């Protein structure tokens, strides 16, 4: 299986409607967003699918090292092998990938946010940065567009959190997030 086939399979297997939207993009942009999306899925799946927090931390540390190696020209994982040839063309920087990993790390360290500022910081890492990268891949360079894409990412993440409140309120050993207790101003 080639790296491109791997990221394609990862995107399809996620069941997300985003994948089908990607199909309308020109092939080079579609390849870039699919590889980036596969990266996000891989990292997020660590938190969602690994029940032992110690193992999850180890896997996220591995991804941090893989990103560092990839930007040094030595990627090994199929996702990074697919993404790196496109990263320069679309302005996908190491800090973007690191932010996504940092956000997933927050999932392991903090399960509740008591104010909107804390929740917004988390959403910035796991979704705002994703919006910014998507805007770059889609060819947008205007800083205002990047800011709007960032805010759209935040809105998507907040919507996901609200959607999952019932599920997260169920008595389990891990509660993903709760809504903040102070109003947003």
What are these regions (language model features)?
Residues 176-185:
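Single conserved hydrophobic/aromatic residue that forms the stacking wall/gate
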